[in-house]
Design a protein with these regions (language model features):
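Membrane-water interface of alpha-helical transmembrane segments
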Residues: 36, 44, 54, 58, ...
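Helical transmembrane-bundle signal
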Residues: 5, 33, 68, 72, ...
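Membrane-interface helix-loop-helix junctions at transmembrane boundaries of multi-pass membrane enzymes
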Residues: 83-94, 169-224
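Membrane-interface helix-loop junctions at the exits of transmembrane helices
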Residues: 1-17, 106-117, 133-144, 199-241
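Periplasmic/ER-lumenal interhelical loops and adjacent helix-loop junctions
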Residues: 94, 98, 103-179, 248
Length: 256
């Protein structure tokens, strides 16, 4: 099972031309922390753990920070929901448990000279390096597989899940047949019981997806829509100009 992650096309490609971004184990660690959140004893414990993880992530490569930030929010809302906090208290706890680790991580990154070479925001190519909605199914010529037409020519959009993962997904879908209605009812029941955590989690996940897609929404070779945002937002966004990378957390969640 570990080979599905270690030998994934995306990691292998990164290992040969961008080793820092091959350190995607940090994403798996973040997902594990979200799953294991109930084992964390308190808000202070969670804050300390994510402070260490976020600092490690940004020192490996700043592109990991937005993804890990979203996972941190999911972990925090899980703890808040488990503790049964409500009203303003839970929002206050959420802000503290997320802002403090992020501020410490960015502060340490600044102290080690992380901003000394600039932000890269002067390069405006968000449209060409955004996440294509068919990236998971397009091999882009990986190994002996053919490449399907793709709107972008950037290699950043290569997120082929791998033939083994797709076979596994099709097999799981076939084995799951007849249980879709039961699963849907369970999801609805969970939503009613934990509507706050579900809404917050869905919101931050959608925001990360929008961030990854960029200012041009592509589906294979076609562009559905291209939009503009105010210049200050665009410049800040352009600091993560290869925004497709922010979809890596969805990549690994799909495999899991």
């Amino acid at each position: 099972g570990a080979s599905l992650f270690v030998l994934s096309p995306m990691v292998l490609a990164r290992s040969f031309y961008h080793p820092a971004l091959a350190g995607q184990w940090i994403i798996l660690l973040g997902i594990l922390l979200v799953i294991e959140t109930p084992r964390l004893k308190s808000a202070g414990h969670l804050t300390a753990v994510w402070m260490i993880v976020l600092t490690g992530a940004i020192l490996i490569h700043p592109y990991f920070l937005p993804m890990m930030g979203v996972l941190m929010v999911l972990s925090a809302v899980r703890l808040i929901d488990r503790q049964g906090w409500s009203g303003r208290y839970r929002w206050r706890a959420l802000v503290i448990m997320t802002i403090v680790p992020a501020a410490v991580a960015v502060g340490i990154f600044y102290l080690v000279g992380g901003f000394s070479l600039g932000t890269g925001a002067e390069v405006y190519d968000l449209a060409d390096k955004g996440f294509n909605l068919l990236s998971f199914v397009n091999p882009l010529g990986y190994s002996v597989l053919p490449a399907f037409p793709n709107r972008s020519i950037s290699g950043e959009t290569m997120m082929w899940l791998g033939l083994g993962v797709w076979l596994m997904l099709f097999l799981a879908t076939w084995l799951w047949r007849g249980n879709y209605q039961v699963t849907w009812l369970r999801l609805r029941r969970y939503w009613r019981r934990h509507h706050w955590i579900c809404r917050v989690g869905l919101t931050v996940s959608m925001l990360l997806l929008v961030f990854a897609v960029g200012v041009r929404i592509d589906v294979g070779p076609a562009t559905l829509v291209q939009y503009s945002v105010p210049k200050p937002i665009y410049e800040l966004w352009s600091a993560f100009r290869a925004s497709a990378r922010e979809a890596w957390v969805f990549y690994y969640t799909t495999i899991l």
